[in-house]
C-alpha cells in the first residue's frame, strides 16, 4: 500500500546511528496522499501519490 503509483517511491529501511556508533533499525516512509486524479481517458480514480509528485504537477487533480 505504501507506494507512490506515479514514481514508485516506497518504504526504505536503514539504521539510525548514535554518536557512540550504536545502530538501531528504522524505516523512512514516503509522504503519500490519496488523491482523486483525472486519467488520460477522462475518468477519475483515487490513487496514492507522494507529495513530491503532487508539487511537481505530475498528476492532474479532479475538481
Swiss-Prot record:
Annotated GO CC locations: ribonucleoprotein complex; ribosome
GO BP annotation list: translation
SUPFAM superfamilies: L28p-like (SSF143800)
Top-level taxonomic group: Bacteria
Keywords: Ribonucleoprotein, Ribosomal protein
GO molecular function annotations of the record: structural constituent of ribosome
InterPro entries listed in its UniProt record: Bacterial_rp_bL28, Ribosomal_bL28, Ribosomal_bL28/bL31-like_sf, Ribosomal_bL28_bact-type, Ribosomal_bL28_sf
Family label: Belongs to the bacterial ribosomal protein bL28 family.
NCBIfam families according to UniProt: L28
Name this polypeptide is given: Large ribosomal subunit protein bL28
Amino acid at each position: 500500500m505504501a507506494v507512490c503509483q506515479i514514481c514508485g517511491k516506497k518504504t526504505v529501511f536503514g539504521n539510525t546511528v548514535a554518536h557512540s556508533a550504536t545502530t538501531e533499525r528504522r524505516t523512512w516512509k514516503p509522504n503519500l496522499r490519496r488523491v482523486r486524479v483525472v486519467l488520460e481517458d477522462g475518468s477519475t480514480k483515487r490513487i496514492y501519490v507522494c507529495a513530491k509528485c503532487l508539487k511537481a504537477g505530475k498528476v492532474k487533480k479532479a475538481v
